[in-house]
């Protein structure tokens, strides 16, 4: 009785489509969840070379900008940490040429990707936390553009795995907010507003994308099963037809 009342309330308040998505998601079988997780990990693995190259190029840009600042002496240490995380990602992950995980690999690779994204987000966030307050205006401009680009693009590159987006963006956004606040809220109102818009808009978009991604994976699996069943039925029909002709 309570569940029916709650469902009716949700249908009236949020709409039938929203509730039906929750119901379908909750009714997903363990096999379907494994299939969705497999496709999520595979999608992330395909983009890992692009992400690794982007991290390396961005770190080089940051190092070049910091070489002209008062923090030039400690900038190489930050760059070494970024290189260490990149090497860790390469060595601990699957082949960079694209890899569809086996059933037994899905859970480990799923959480490995999330942990690696958190490390990258923390390193990028530390760039602002360590260097922004004492940097010159031109260096601040480079750091702001660079960090904003990585924060925004993470929602697209990692969209197949929403938890990875949050693992990457949360530490980065928090450290950017702290850095901008320390440098003066009034002078960085625009940047703080952009982060606020990101925090409000992208989770909604990610949720919709994740629902559509899961529905598409399950639908394609069902189509494959039905196609296989039809092929078997046609094969049996052809075999029986040949017996009748004989």
What are these regions, as identified by a protein language model?
Residues 26, 30-31, 44-100, 196-197, ...:
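Hydrophobic alpha-helical transmembrane segments of multi-pass membrane proteins
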Residues 6-15, 41-55:
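Hydrophobic transmembrane alpha-helical segments in integral membrane proteins
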Residues 114-204:
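Hydrophobic transmembrane alpha-helices
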Residues 96-101, 135-139, 162, 210-221:
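Membrane-interfacial segments
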Residues 228-246:
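PAS/LOV and related PAS-like sensory modules
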Residues 196-229:
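Juxtamembrane or sensor-core-proximal signal-transducing alpha helices
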Residues 101-117:
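Juxtamembrane helix-capping/reentrant segments at transmembrane boundaries
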Residues 2-33:
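Short, charged cytosolic
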